[in-house]
Design a protein with these regions (language model features):
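Helix-coil modules at protein/domain termini and other flexible surface or pore-lining loops
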Residues: 1-207
Length: 207
């Protein structure tokens, strides 16, 4: 995490049924180039799996051995208005899931500590409780218990306040797993994807 994270303008260059800074073909080509240079077996192949009944192309991205070992899954699905959009979608689903699990597996990304020791450096328990709509009436007691738990904390950036904050990674991962993990052609594009997914899942749970 850099000392300061800044959102920049991301100009749309592709607007065919979606707004992106690159075309779907450029997205696929960028991934293939970066994956080849990583020295990891991430993507085995992509396959078109729809039968044309709905007129919506659907692709699967089949995990390479390194991705399969890391994520525990064999494939992801992606859809789009065109076959190349669907293929790019399936690949980016793999990218975000693989990246999340790889991040989780790297001890250098975390510090194990109690919230009671981190104090103002960490996200407050009140915010965590609101994020899951806790209406138990035992917030104070649960907060004291939570503050004493040794957890893995990772550095994040609070976009609203413009500052770093420590997040209890495993607390979020246990509840959400890969909900909200996101990939894009740039930081801003990825964040739009991830934030919208969190809103989508939250509303779904709410109703």
């Amino acid at each position: 995490m850099p000392d300061k994270f800044t959102l920049n303008d991301a100009y749309k260059r592709f607007t065919g049924d979606q707004d992106k800074v690159l075309t779907p073909r450029e997205t696929i080509d960028n991934f293939m180039q970066k994956a080849a240079g990583a020295g990891l077996d991430i993507l085995k192949e992509t396959r078109r799996v729809d039968r044309g009944r709905l007129g919506i192309p659907v692709y699967s991205s089949i995990c390479g051995q390194d991705a399969k070992n890391m994520t525990g899954t064999a494939k992801q699905m992606g859809k789009g208005a065109t076959p190349v959009q669907a293929e790019a979608s399936a690949i980016m689903e793999l990218v975000e899931r693989f990246s999340l699990y790889r991040f989780s597996a790297n001890p250098a990304n975390f510090q194990t500590d109690r919230q009671a020791d981190l104090k103002d450096k960490s996200m407050s328990f009140a915010v965590l409780a609101r994020s899951v709509d806790d209406i138990s009436g035992n917030i104070d007691a649960v907060g004291r218990f939570f503050a004493d738990l040794p957890l893995r904390w990772t550095t994040a950036w609070n976009l609203t306040r413009g500052e770093k904050v420590l997040l209890p990674f495993d607390w979020f991962f246990a509840i959400n797993q890969f909900n909200g993990s996101c990939a894009g052609n740039c930081n801003e594009e990825a964040l739009c994807q991830g934030i919208c997914e969190v809103v989508e899942r939250h509303v779904c749970c709410d109703i």
